[in-house]
Each structure stands twice: as C-alpha cells, then as structure tokens.
Amino acid sequence: MAIRPGEASGRASGRTALETIGLGKRYGRRWALRDCTFRLPAGRICALAGPPGAGTSTLLSLASGLLRPTEGTVRVCGESGPAGRARVAHVTQGKPLYPRLTVAETLRLGRELNPGRWNDRCAEQIVRDGGLSLGARAGVLPEGQRTVLAFALAFAREPELLLLDDPLDGLDPLDRHRIAALLLARSAERATTVVLSSQALAELDGICDYLLVLGGGRVRLAGEADDVVGMHTLVMGERRGEGLPREIAAHTVIDTQLSGRHFTALVRRKGPLAPGPWEAAEPSLEELLLGYLRAPGAPGLIAPSAEPVSSRRPHRPGGRPGIPGMPRNGRPGTAGVPGGTPHTSYHHHSGKGAAA
C-alpha cells in the first residue's frame, strides 16, 4: 500500500506509536483482554477487528487511559501514564456529545478542556467542510454530521495517536465515503497514527495499512497489511475426497468454505504452493480478516513488524530475535491462541470467500 503524505518521516525513524506487553483486563472472573502483546509503528492507519466480545473496545479504552489494566503495560509514543495519555484522542462508540450544546458551543468546550493543545483552525475547517451549521444543536444532527463533529474535536487536539471505536457504524454508504476521505486527509497532514475499529471489513481495505485482529481477548493477527496479506493464498477448486488435497493441507490452513463439490481455502503458506487443478490468488484484506474471524482455533500470526522492541530476546548465533511462542517471518505459531483446528463451514453460495 502507498505511504501517506507526511508519513515517511515517522516510518524512517522507526518510532513506535503504541506498544503493549502482556496487557490484560479482567472483570470479576472474566478476562476481556489477556496477554495482549504487540507494537504499532508510528504513521500507520491500523485496522482493529474482532468478533463481538473480542476485546477491541477494551483495548482502545486501556490505550487511552479510560480503563486501568489488570496486568501488563501499555505505552503511547514511548510514554506510560499521564504523559502517554496526553498524546491520545479517543472517539468512543456512539460518539457521545452534549445534545443541548450547539456546534459552536461544543467546539468552545473542547478548547476550554484542552488548554495549550487545541487547534481552532483545524476544528473550524472540519466543521465547515462537513457542512455543519455552528448554531445547530448536537442532539439533532444526523449521524454523519455527529461523526464529523466528533472528528473535529479529536483532530483539533492534534493527537499523535487517534483511537476510533467503530466510527462508521450507523452511516450510510455516502457518509462512510466522506468520513473515510476526511480521516485519510486529516491523518496525513500530521502523520497521525490511527487505530480504527470497525465491523465494516470491506471499508477497511482502502483505508488501513496495518492489521490487528483480536479473538477471545487475545491477539490473533498483527503486522503490516501488505506483508501479512502476502503470506496468505486463497485457493479455490473442486473437492475429490473428504478433505483438502494434500498439497494444500501441507500448508497452514486457516479457514475452509465448502459449497457442494467446491472448496475455498485460506492458507498461510509454508513455502511455494504446488500447482494443481485449482486456482490460487492473493486474498483481499476483507477475505483475510473474514478467514481469521471465522476460525478462532486456527494458528495466529504476529509478523516481525508487530513484535514489541522491548520484549525481543537478545540475538543469539543461529537464531532470530523474537517473542517466545510467536511465529517469525510467517512461520506457523499460536501467538497466544489456544491450539485448535482450522475452521470449516458448509453452505450454499457462489463466489469465493463468502461468509458462513
């Protein structure tokens, strides 16, 4: 994927925007997030995905300081505690706003609550470009304009890390397109790192260049989007027995979809895929995410780009630095996910990668 304008300096410096080590949050006896370890380099737009209850909202709240961790650490731009939280803006689910305040009053309140860290020009331009009336009350704004106002409050703080919890939820296709364009343009201006949680997987493909997938409160998949997608192949063909052909089963099979006599399999390659009576293609970002979401027992993957620097073991002759138990360079591993088998579902459909 192309590097956004203004992003190159953040990438070249190797800076880290968000890093967690063994992060966990427990409510009573239930762990909402457990053993969460990853690194997000600066300047990325990261897709955060997971099924309901996966821990995505919990992770964002821990990163912004809304929640305290039960265990582990979280650092923003190398800082923990108040110093790290000062670098974050967080748009939570539902985009809560004071309904009786006008747009102008909402922006004024934002300025008063963020002394010394507020860009009036940025806030006003976002509101103006979004077609909002300064006299309109926040409580009567349509959903798309509520999102624009929430983004104005967030970007006006000039955060280094912007956390967005399902901001596209409830928007019509036109509003989603407008909000995505706003996000890309504004984050590019200051090379703001963005973590975007969304259930609209198709929308993430043209926005995000980094992936983080949670499942069961644990990290399932993390790394540069191009690298992670490139490690996988979508294979489609006709079944000639009960299972997959052995040439395909020899790789790490993440997810298999069966329709009549045909199969579609998402595999993480261990090497070159042998030729055969099947078609092979690189999966789209949506197909990759769907495969991992449908297969909670399949081996996870933490790419080298997502390994926290502070937890890497010293290099030893004959070995590679990394995190114990996590795969390196695309090799199979559990990445903290209990062992299990790849997911297979039976349904009637035509077309590759359809959801079960």
What is each stretch, according to the model?
Residues 177-267:
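ABC transporter nucleotide-binding domain
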Residues 49-51:
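The feature captures the beta-strand-to-loop junction immediately N-terminal to the Walker
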Residues 64:
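Helix-to-loop junction immediately C-terminal to a conserved catalytic motif
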Residues 94-149:
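ABC-family P-loop ATPase nucleotide-binding domains
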Residues 162-166:
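Catalytic Walker B motif of ABC-type/P-loop ATPase nucleotide-binding domains
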